[in-house]
Each structure stands twice: as structure tokens, then as C-alpha cells.
């Protein structure tokens, strides 16, 4: 049996997109995931949660592919003037109107302070632009999620304001004291105001306060499964340190019974938690314990020290000793024919005559993107979407 490998980039690559005569910075909250980023990670074409499905039905999939563009170009600190009540989560833009849906079932992330009383927020940014501030607001006690979010629903002052932060490995990491006395579900509203431009970015972050007094863990992000995997597939959690070196690897070969989209994250989490004291996967409770659950998206990856990131590699079996997909020289399309049909695994022939395979989700969404950036072999960021065969 031969195998071929795919990397599930659970913390996806972001891009610094420089359009002619206009530079655009992009970003959104990664930990805890913003509403738009969380829905993107569920899969724009087939999100898992009812709320994200409703967002796509209301605003289309493009809003999720553009998860890093929830912004206003001329905010310049006047946020209430450019983002109307009821449209805070979508930054007042029609493209993102699905994010404004008033509902109580938006997927939320449990958060708790560490031993110092802080929580580390991680913002995924695509370019090192100068920061005027990151402001973090929280909804008032008694906020009704079934009514559109208004500015008056937020506490009048931010509970955290960051004015100096360095971009490291594509992220801003900010330690903030969490607001006191908050329990249950709330919305954190984040504003990133640039100092080198009037542009500002906005993010609704759905959270739940666990009530834990001291949390020994730092969240890195959710372990998400997009689909069932075949028996014989191997899933590997890779943990990288601040220098990008492999710190730990935990592999599990799946069998019938633990290869479903809800089962294999549970099985991998159980193995990791048994083997490692540095990293655990699961749901955090009020006592600081991390317990795996059978779910395709609810398990989070936690570490005991800052400075780590993770990814999950998936090695799929190819029955009958066959070659890696595309190994026989055949292609599904000559690029850009059939562009809207491109998905993970699609093989195309580029303008250079070479064959390229569309990468696994979440990178697969870029395969349908603008050819200036994603044309296989020649786009400015083609390697984020395609693998040369």
C-alpha cells in the first residue's frame, strides 16, 4: 500500500495582497477565532454549524473566503460613524451581512485567565503595518444575542487596549486581563486601527467565560475535521516552537470505527493527552482540565507555554499500490477551464505545461481565486493553493 500526504493547515497561511496602486492589510482574530474566521475554518462551501450555514445563506461564501477583510478604509478612529448599529460584526459592509445575524447559537470558545489573570489573544495578520491600537470591548451583562449587536450593547470602555505589539510569524500576540465578573456567553468586539492608514479592521468574537480562576493552558486553535477519513489513514499532530522547529509529533493510524469526522479528532486527542504533558486537546472546564469530545470542531489544542503553533498532517492510503493522484500524467482541467469546479485534489495543467494539484482544505479555497495571485506556477501566491506534481 502506498500513501500520499496532505497537510491540514489548521492555522492557515495568510497573504499580503498588494493590489495595483493600493496596499491592503488583512487580518482577523485567530485565538479565540472571530466569527468570520471560525466559519471559514468550518469550510465556506459546507460549514458545519447552523449559524455559519445561515451566514452563507444570507451573504454567500465569498465573505468567508475574505475572512481577513472585514474593514472600513476610512475609519480613522471614528468607528461608530462608519459602522452602523446592527452591522458591527460585518463592519457595515454588505458582503459580510451574514455575520450580523442575531442568533444565540454562534459557535463560541471557552476562555479563562491564566495564573497571572491574563488571556493571550492571537491576531492573524498578513502584513506588518503600524498599529495605532487594538481595542477589546465586551458585551454588557444581559446582552440579548437574538437582537442585532449595537454599540450600546458594549461596555463603554475597552477592557484591554494595546498600542505597541510586534508582528511575529504572521501574528500579533497580546496578553490582556479579562473583564471581571463576566459569566456565560458574550461577544468580544475587537477593533484594529492602523496608524499608517485610516483603515480599521473589526471582529466579533463569540466566547463563553468558564469561571475558572486560573487556567494553566494557552489555546492555539481548534482541531477541525472536514470529513471522514479512510481506514488506514494516519493523522499526525505536529507542534512547532517559536523558531519553527518540530517540538513534538503525535501520530495515529485510523481504523474502522474511529475514522469518522467526529471520531478521529477524539481518538487523536486521547492519544496526545496520554502521551504529552506539554500539549492537550479537548474542551477546557472550569477547573483547568482538558477533556476530548467526539466532535468535528469543538476540540481545542492547548499548550502550557507560549510561543507554539500546530498543524495536523494527514497521510491517506492509496489502495492497490497505485501512484499518488495525478501520477499518471492525466489532468482534470487545463487551467483556468472549469475554475469554479476546483476543489481539494483537483489536478490541472498550468500555462507552463506542468501539472498542479489543488491543496487540501482550507487552502483549497484559493484554487478558485484571482489568477494574479493563484494561477498555478505563476501567480504571486500560487504555492499557497497548489502543489507541483
From Swiss-Prot:
Alphabetic keyword roster: Chitin-binding, Phosphoprotein, Secreted, Signal
InterPro entries, A to Z: Cellulose/chitin-bd_N, GbpA_2, GlcNAc_Chitin_IntDeg, Ig_E-set
One GO MF term: chitin binding
Entry keyword Secreted: yes
The keyword Nucleus appears for this protein: no
Domain named Chitin-binding type-4: residues: 26-208
Record's signal peptide: 1-25
Modified residues (Phosphotyrosine): 37
PANTHER family, sorted: CHITIN-BINDING TYPE-4 DOMAIN-CONTAINING PROTEIN (PTHR34823:SF1), GLCNAC-BINDING PROTEIN A (PTHR34823)
Name of the molecule in the record: Chitin-binding protein CbpD
Organism this protein belongs to: Pseudomonas aeruginosa (strain UCBPP-PA14)
Upper lineage: Bacteria, Pseudomonadati, Pseudomonadota, Gammaproteobacteria, Pseudomonadales
